[in-house]
């Protein structure tokens, strides 16, 4: 079913993105890391909750089958793209036209996304440690009037319509001087409910190597996002929209003889 062909001899619409580009994007979710990097792939994020940033994907617009989502294959097995650790991705290829997706039949009618994870190489053992810390903050928040400006402009609008002002001068003075917050509150709820930024952390430890007989690649990872909600500590349980993820990947290739190979791929994710 699968084979190799020189790129210059291929006439199909195929675009490939190397894993290095995915790794260098400071994001914890592969769904967001490839946004804008693959021509023809449209990504629509439907959720901003940490760890749930996935959404809808379309290849060259909407197609005909089911929910129009491309078929995602990770090492030849159907998987969700957002359960992968970006560091374990070797390459991502998208098959966009009928010539490229013909071997997948009806399942490929919406396009196909092929993800290849990293594997061992015939080399000395290579140990890698990747640690990243970043700050995440809201890009744009609405700006609301304070209580005094709202009351003043509300009175002005009523006067312009030939009506009596709703707020008295005494009330306006209280709003202005903020001397009676119980009866004349002036709260900035966005400032109270949201933090200025959240801390995002990501740590990965990988081991890669092999020889002529066996090749291996192992990865363990941890990622977290502290969340943007400004919560207190009165509860024994967490009330913030946070995320903690533990992931593991193990790819082992063993060549028993020249006609018989064994490949064992294991992956897990807990969130």
Model-derived segments and their meaning:
Residues 1-250, 254-257, 261-263:
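Short, small/polar-rich motifs associated with maturation and membrane association
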Residues 266:
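Cationic-aromatic interfacial patches
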Residues 270-271:
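Short, intrinsically disordered, charge-balanced linker/junction segments flanking boundaries
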